[in-house]
């Protein structure tokens, strides 16, 4: 029996955005100085972080110049990504943001988690030190877990339907952006230097009339 050529469509794709801030080195140096001062004064929070320092969720309200500058950059980057993904978004919707600092010393990591209640989640990379062991390419990498269910093959056979993962280790000055439902975790920092990132969530709200 003859049949037509199969017509394949991809459904339920997950957008993943990478943006690099141009000439970020000077901004990152100022951020590191401001963050160090905050660490001396603030005890930090316990969230998905293991052994690291997690600031309050107040990035977008901070008075420090570099914090404020980065907050503005994040607003613009999230807005640009949203416009590209959803150009016909209703005009009465606006994005509200929250953000925080993560400082991860040696062996610190972030346990698997997602960010319910938001639309976008993201991370900006301030300092990404190399592992003390040059052969360790996973130090401080962020790993995303395929949100789809998978066929129960017990890991014996890789197929397009097998639950997968995506791992990336961005350079300093890079911002990653993904849908907040996407579960992820951060590999342990295997460097003697602190790894420093800025994480954030963005959600929609109706603009006041």
Feature map (PLM): residue ranges:
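Non-heme Fe(II)/2-oxoglutarate
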Residues: 2-88, 109
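Solvent-exposed residues in well-ordered beta-strands and their adjoining turns
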Residues: 20-22, 104, 125-127, 201-205
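Short hydrophobic/aromatic beta-strand or adjacent loop that forms the aromatic wall/cage
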Residues: 14-16, 121, 195
């Amino acid at each position: 029996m003859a049949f037509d050529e199969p017509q394949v469509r991809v459904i339920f794709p997950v957008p993943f955005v990478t943006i690099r801030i141009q000439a970020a080195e000077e901004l990152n140096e100022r951020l590191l100085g401001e963050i160090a001062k905050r660490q001396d004064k603030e005890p930090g929070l316990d969230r998905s972080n293991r052994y690291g320092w997690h600031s309050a969720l107040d990035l977008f309200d901070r008075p420090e110049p570099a914090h404020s500058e980065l907050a503005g950059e994040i607003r613009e980057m999230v807005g640009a990504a949203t416009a590209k993904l959803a150009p016909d978004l209703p005009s009465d919707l606006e994005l509200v943001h929250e953000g925080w600092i993560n400082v991860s010393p040696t062996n610190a990591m972030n346990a698997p988690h997602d960010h319910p209640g938001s639309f976008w989640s993201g991370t900006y990379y301030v300092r990404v030190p190399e592992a003390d062991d040059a052969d360790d390419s996973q130090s401080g990498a962020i790993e995303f877990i395929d949100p789809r269910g998978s066929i129960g093959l017990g890991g014996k056979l890789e197929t397009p339907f097998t639950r997968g993962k995506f791992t990336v280790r961005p350079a300093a000055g890079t911002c990653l952006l993904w849908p907040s439902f996407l579960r992820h975790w951060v590999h342990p920092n295997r460097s003697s230097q602190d790894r420093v990132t800025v994480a954030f969530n963005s959600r929609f709200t109706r603009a006041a009339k």
